[in-house]
């Protein structure tokens, strides 16, 4: 994945459900082609196959469990999401928190199935710990700022720069994404200036009246 990398999390917003998931993915694809910036989406689990079947762009799962084939009713199996069309997964989002053991198991399963892993964290120490596990990305998102419209890159820039420094010391191969409150061009520019390689965002684009226009605004200062 190139830098900057934009990962759009649909969460369970109505606008990103069903056919809406496809339409937002099409907007992401169009902006990505126009700009050369890689944009990936994380739709709800049942929509992964729908989006993958209609739009060519990287798709991430919002969650996966560290389980294999067998008696794991209700769990998210890595092989299933990969065959549905996903190329990666979020792990430990603040709205879907896991224990350390579960994070390790999910990451191990992601690697087993060749899925790119984004471990979400909430402060510098947890970011450092996550980097030691060697995911592809860590995404720093203070939970109090998620969905607030107040970007972490402005509200708490030290947590971003501190996370970037901590990860560089532990494993320079792990990339850092900045999340929470990201929605405008100034937010992405600030995140990149603080050393992150991209952003993880959601409502600012998914709930926008015109997601394509919102994405174009997001990347205008890159």
Curated annotation (Swiss-Prot):
Any Pfam family the entry gives: TIM
Catalytic activity: D-glyceraldehyde 3-phosphate = dihydroxyacetone phosphate
Domain of life: Archaea
GO BP terms in the entry: gluconeogenesis; glyceraldehyde-3-phosphate biosynthetic process; glycerol catabolic process; glycolytic process
GO terms for cellular component: cytosol
Binding-site list for substrate: 9-11, 146, 181, 202-203
Matches recorded under InterPro entries: Aldolase_TIM (IPR013785), TIM_sf (IPR035990), Triosephosphate_isomerase (IPR000652), Triosephosphate_isomerase_arc (IPR022891)
The EC number(s) this enzyme carries: 5.3.1.1
Pathway: Carbohydrate biosynthesis; gluconeogenesis; Carbohydrate degradation; glycolysis; D-glyceraldehyde 3-phosphate from glycerone phosphate: step 1/1
Record-annotated active site: 93 (electrophile), 141 (proton acceptor)
Annotated PROSITE patterns: TIM_2
A molecular function (GO) term: triose-phosphate isomerase activity
Main location, first listed in the record: cytoplasm
EC main group: isomerase
Keywords assigned: Cytoplasm, Gluconeogenesis, Glycolysis, Isomerase
Subcellular location: Cytoplasm
Membership in a protein family: Belongs to the triosephosphate isomerase family.
Main function: Involved in the gluconeogenesis. Catalyzes stereospecifically the conversion of dihydroxyacetone phosphate (DHAP) to D-glyceraldehyde-3-phosphate (G3P).
Quaternary organization: Homotetramer; dimer of dimers.
Designated name of the protein: Triosephosphate isomerase
Organism: Methanosarcina acetivorans (strain ATCC 35395 / DSM 2834 / JCM 12185 / C2A)
